[in-house]
Amino acid sequence: MYTTVFYWALMLAGMLSQQPASSSASSASLNFEVFRTKIQPIFLARRPGHARCIACHGSGTPLRLQPLPPGSATWNEEDSRKNFQAVQRVVLPGVPLKSRLLIHPLAEEAGGDFYHNGGKHWSSQNDPEWQALKAWVLGETRTSGD
C-alpha cells in the first residue's frame, strides 16, 4: 500500500513540476477585437475556386460559425462572441502550426495537413490571410494597420 501511495505522490509531483511546452504558447492570448476586425472578415472572403468559410462552417462541422443576420454583411457583437468561442476550440494560442484553424486549410507542401473538406485556401504561409491568422494566434493586439 505504501508503495502505491509513494508512486502516486511521485507522479503528482512530476506533473506539477513540469513546465509548459512553450513559453510563447502559455503567454499568448487571443484578442477578441482583433478577431472581430481582422479574423472574422477572412471567414466571409470569397476565394476563386472555393466556397467562403461561412458556407460550410455554418452547421455540421466542428468549427461552427453563427449564420449572418438577414441582410447583414457581418456579425453583430453577440454572434461575434459566439464565433470567438467556437474558433478558440481550434486554436492553440502561441502555436500557429499546431492550430487546426491554420493547418487544415493550408496546402500540405506549405506545412498544412490533409484534413479540410473545403479544400486548401492558402498555398503558402506567406498568404496575407494566413499571416493575419498567424499574428492573431501569436497574440496580435493591434486592430488597425498602424
How would you name each of these model-derived features?
Residues 4-15:
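Bacterial N-terminal signal peptides
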